[in-house]
């Protein structure tokens, strides 16, 4: 079936709720309204208010209540309307969600999946366009997942919902309706913690995730016209990171470019660059470069293009790498 990322996410939620009656969805407007982006559309009518719960605008309460649900054997799926609204819940996530399994020596698990849209590219204001995934990657005990297409969105979400450990599931708003793709109607999993090479190349490696994958593809096609073969690695799971896949690619190509829309300073690109330096230094023909968002608050919509990494900036970085 051809579907958008929103439809793929909705189908994954529907199928898993049918399969496992312990799955509970909760969040602001997820019930009767079907979610701010309609990712939960139809679920309230199908499963009822006891399994699709509208909550107040209180992120700490949404996540805190979800922790309590896991103690009762449920598998909650809290939705936060935008990544920029998650910060009131950080104490719950850092102090409890990520630690309970270790704190109880495995007697309790926290099988919850926190879903939230993230990222710029849709002309939205600051709290609605943030990309602070590196904050979650700094917290041991969390799995951080970002799909870049409808097929992966369904499979990764299915795998997340079946995980006994907590997952931060980040959904790029720019890609919600940007692309339609063939997605199997039957249920399936895309493995967590596994990166994938989505484009083969011999001259350099681009490492990216989420909405930066389509941008990297556009830049790679333009570079191909100039005789440069760019390989693209889609991380898919940001933490724990599949370092082996991108290190193997860099050892083959000899050049590396990391692309993310989060600000540059202390972004995940720095960790990836350090990993390459530690594991593939002698294979490098050029320094590792980064194309990222600017180190500023997300600007007003008319200036978004100055902040947001696009194919043109990626192509310029490719050309610079090939000068070495």
Spell out what each predicted region is:
Residues 1-166, 170, 173-324:
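Thiamine diphosphate
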